[in-house]
Amino acid sequence: MNGLIMAGQLLLGLSLLVILHELGHFLAARAFGIKVEKFYLFFDAWGFKLFSFKKGDVEYGVGWLPLGGYVKIAGMIDESMDTEQMAQPAQPWEFRSKPAWQRLIVMLGGIIVNVIVGIIIFWMLTFKYGQNYTVNGKLTDGISVGNIGKEIGLKNGDRILAINGSKLIKFEDAISSKVLFDGAQLTILRGNQTLYISVPDTILNKLSKNDKENFIAPRYRMASVATVLAPDEKADQQSFFDKIFGRPYVKPVYPAYAAGIKPGDSILAVNGKSVTFFDQFKEEVSQNKNKQITINALRKGKEINFDVLVGKEGTIGIAPNFKMPETAHVEFGFAESLPIGATMAWSTFLDNAKGIGKMITGKLSARNISSPIGIAKVYGSTFDWVKFWTLTGLISMALAFMNLLPIPGLDGGHVVFLLIEMVQRKPVSEKVLEKAQIVGFVILICLMVFAFGNDILKSFGK
């Protein structure tokens, strides 16, 4: 069921974005009197399709291959490679008969719509839900530092005062792209000492293999045990994707449950060492993989010791209650939400550009390229309206950027050839366009295979 929810959210989000993207091309073409022959969600490769109907001169349908969609524009060299049509004399209602500036607008139509959709999504989310953030000035216990944060010199309990000299108001900014992409300088208060620590611009490559908590997070004081993982026949099942990829099923273990720890217990010490903060508890436990530890806890005013065998992952299967840091909520009016939404959309677009740049320069591994499998996992196994639209907005901006790349077969490839035509004042030959289309198609197939391979290997923990 979890896998179906993931797949369903992915299908819904991508289908919406693909239809709107292709609608951008469709409307631009029709506005200039260009004939559109097909409008398809998914590809009807080799002529197979789920269904179709014809209205006017346009065939609308749903293909069987869920890797995007397309509009077939008359007189245009595209993925259909209809060379027979291109061999005929150009007709006034064909793409190739129109001025270069009109063809350029048609090719940019889908990208423009994706950008507009991204802005609208972030605009409406900001207007409807406002913004929540952790008040950095209230983090009196400082930060909890993961392994990657420790590598650059950060320590548990440090307080971040500023980023690149600007006072840090929202803690979330410390784990945003302005720090992770651009190699920022952090102003740190450690005890009574002010320090300056530089974040290397290669740090994202390490974080991509983990989560942001392996960098920094607010430091949480432990209260009591909230949850103790216990055997559950329904929950203890092999995941949907593990079944697909044949990954061996490992039955979960429940060390805390087996030792007798219960929700409501307050953990005081591990192996005699006091643990006030969750990072202290986590560190003591993780250092004792496959070993027995003694946990001292308080239950109804009475101290009790538990002998717990730590699992091979370095966990014991509990989730504590935390004394959460202070957060702030800001509401925005309808009009003032627009520039905020536009800024969020533009930042997402720039982050995609920076990511590609870092891959080209070797500062970010190409292993971060994801297929629909990876995207589905990001959507998650439960439906959350805000998360769904946030991710859909992010993907809309990512699609806009990816389609702008100068790869033949993508919108950006067509744009490059049109710009060349406008500069040299004569069109690029159809033979060159046809060969470029084939090369681009091969590149895209290779990228797709690579992306699926990445996600399959990740599912095996490689």
Segment roles from a protein language model:
Residues 69, 73-80, 84-145, 236, ...:
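Internal alpha-helical transmembrane segments
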Residues 2-86, 402-424:
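Small-residue-rich helix-interface/hinge motifs
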Residues 82-123, 163-211, 352:
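Interdomain regulatory linker/hinge segments that flank or connect interaction modules
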Residues 14-18, 72, 114, 118, ...:
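Alpha-helical transmembrane segments of multi-pass membrane proteins
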Residues 2, 6-10, 98-107, 387-391:
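Residue-level signature of transmembrane alpha-helical entry/exit and packing/kink sites
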Residues 89-98, 212-266, 273-401, 416-439, ...:
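Functional transmembrane alpha-helices
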Residues 149, 157-160, 256, 264-267:
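A structural signal for short beta-strand/turn segments enriched in small hydrophobics and glycine
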